[in-house]
Amino acid sequence: MARAFLFVLDSFGIGNAPDAGAFGDLGADTLGHIAEFCAAGAADRAGLREGPLNLPNMSALGLMHAARLATGRLPAGMALPERVYGVYGAASEVSRGKDTPSGHWEIAGTPVTFDWGYFPADGDAFPPELVEAICREGDVPGILGNCHASGTDIIARLGEEHMRTGKPICYTSSDSVFQIAAHEQTFGLERLQDLCAVVRRLVDEYNIGRVIARPFVGSDPGSFTRTGNRRDYSVLPPAPTVLDRLKEAGRTVHAIGKIADIFAHQGVTRLTKANGNMALFDASLAAIDEAEDGALIFTNFVDFDMLYGHRRDVAGYAAALEAFDARLPDLDRRLKPGDMVILTADHGCDPTWRGTDHTRERVPVLMFGPTLRSRSVGIVGSFAHIGETVASHLGIDPGPHGRSLI
């Protein structure tokens, strides 16, 4: 029996989606712009990286071909490999948001066909009645922020006041999200998580996709640092996903990183938390070593998005891609006949783009394994085809959206 390993490189877009203009993202290209900066020497950073973007292993799996499918051109400073070893394509999203739940749920075979609720960018972000309910039911003396903001910026700006007053820092973005930052020592991690659970219930009527706990440590703006204890409080997917179908079939669904949170723990039989891309890769390799026939291992590599995309750090994003690429031979050596790996993404987050939000982009679909023969699957019309490919490979019934690519 087969095994499937689904790796989401969070925010690794490869060119604007056909409907990017409706999102204000026409021209966004996470991979292309990173490569352009690297080729121009604008992403050199002493002690970190230098030169053109170097992704030999993903290129050999078809990344350059997928990027050319998405944009009609090769990324700057990069060339086609002599040979491609994987099945490759570029996928467009049909869900109506460019957020994490929409992307992941669609990858798992369940597109989001409704509109999320969003908080306004002008004036106070949150309705007064919601703030009052949070203070009353969450037992806090008030909130700070109440605006659209970058998480690191707002912690630097309001962190000391938060520590002094005990008021949590509450903010949002262009995504359907309510984020709460609080100090792990002065406010308490458990208290923050309890508050997020309260807010999750309160924002249901606003149709908000996620509440996110953003704990941090430090004593002043120069030392404030977000910790690895982030937690996402998502609503349930609107319909069963491939995770549910696998679980119902008695299969192992091993969620690594924030995958379990994204799916509100539905359809997950085992979970592993890890902090940082390399720790997530190590956890994935350990899971592969133990995975039985018929299992799905599903990992989200969050650093690309959280540390580099939103922070518009081109050099950091490039270095993270190169570090991930260098680990792929470790994965390849562990594969057995019947194994299939899929590398993809949930949306874009172009680190050269205006603002700090996600970008509406096509994503790569790179599939490989001992029994897969190299070919192109072209432009894929929905991320849902990825989930149906997993379902077909693992021998379970298909879902209502998408089709297998193999």
UniProtKB/Swiss-Prot annotation:
UniProt catalytic activity: 2-deoxy-alpha-D-ribose 1-phosphate = 2-deoxy-D-ribose 5-phosphate; alpha-D-ribose 1-phosphate = D-ribose 5-phosphate
Cofactor: Mn(2+)
Species per Swiss-Prot/TrEMBL record: Sinorhizobium medicae (strain WSM419) (Ensifer medicae)
Protein name: Phosphopentomutase
Residues binding Mn(2+) 1, per UniProt: 10, 346-347
Annotated GO biological process: 2-deoxyribose 1-phosphate catabolic process; 5-phosphoribose 1-diphosphate biosynthetic process; metabolic compound salvage; nucleotide metabolic process
Family: Belongs to the phosphopentomutase family.
UniProt cross-references to CDD domains, sorted A to Z: PPM
Known role: Isomerase that catalyzes the conversion of deoxy-ribose 1-phosphate (dRib-1-P) and ribose 1-phosphate (Rib-1-P) to deoxy-ribose 5-phosphate (dRib-5-P) and ribose 5-phosphate (Rib-5-P), respectively.
